[in-house]
Amino acid sequence: MNGEKLLSPAGRCADPRLVARAARHTADLLPGDALHAVFLRSPIARGRIRHLSIDAARSAAGVTAILTADDAAQDGVEYMVWTGAPVRDDGAASSESQRPLLNRAVIRHLGEPVCMIIAKTQKAALDAMELIDVAYDADDEIALSIDDLQGPLVWPGSADNIAAFHRLGYKPAVDAALAKAAQTVRFDFDISKVTACTIEMRSALGSIDANGKLCLTTSAQSPFALHGELAKLFDLPTDQIRVIAPDVGGSFGMKGALYREDALVVWAAKRLQQAVFWSADRSESFISDEHARAVCGTAVLGLDADGLFTGLWVEANTDTGAYLSRRTKGMLNNIGGVAGQYKTPVIASALTFFYTNTMQTSPYRGFGRPEATYIIERLIDKAA
């Protein structure tokens, strides 16, 4: 290949189709006999399910099935697969949190799915959901702040709400460098929790293909990761599961995980031997999509008389939500980004992940790099 061709800009072939309303999203790919699913979700952030009766809803017009945690347990898919969460640098296991596909007892955040209602139409499913008799006992205290270590425990039986922690670098060397510095600059940071607002809300279609394989069609940006996790969840060889990601109407990180709804529609399709489709509405997305950021802490930068960096210490606390996942450790993966493009002889950090009664957090737009870059650049601004 000659140099001229190598440096020529590549044409964009997808744009005309997308801007001409010819995109093919998950909702455009439904088979004619697809069933529609909706979820009864917890209206409280912390408490217990006191009573649940689905008898009246089960006999409603158009209803095919109403699935609960008991059904999931019966089929051996009660909990999400928990892999690759943050580690502790003292060698101890992280505080493991089992995330149920459908909740049967303890509510840990607003919007946890309790029942899956499946019907011939979405309207029929929504009408049936109104007939479900459910009562909750809400707790008066809710763990919303990572600052309150002695607050109500998200996971009773634990010593505190620390999910995991990790230390990087050699702190004594940084302490010595800061003690000798001509100037030290401290920056207390608080990076707010955010959520996404994509054009296409999350949607998922579970089905059985012509070869008898389980199939998930979903608006996801990481189909290969989802493929492996589904295989573990259903205890199947990877060649018995397919994940198809058609055109995705926005994500920026939020659609990078295997969500409970993805697993649930595949399980329902397997159980009913019929395609099952679910799509969130805007309000549902707000409480069921993974959140991001939610990092606070302190950073200290040492400088010599000439303004050269001598040492950097970063202590960061991350709100991980009620459950850990493989994507929780975004801040850990890229905490090295605090070094930036600058020469700093010694750097150390302490990262602590806290449980709260909120939706779990995951990385948006950079997997921890934006937070790390913000910290060092604001420190330099203050030093200047």
Regions found by a protein language model. Name each.
Residues M1-I162, T184, R271:
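Flexible, low-hydrophobicity surface segments
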Residues D28-L29, R48-R50, G76-V77, A125-A128, ...:
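Short helix/loop capping segments that flank catalytic or ligand/cofactor-binding pockets
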Residues D33-H36, A60-T64, N103-R104, L110-V114, ...:
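Short coil/turn connectors at secondary-structure junctions
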Residues T83-A124, G253-A305, T361-A384:
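Glycine-rich and small/hydrophobic secondary-structure elements
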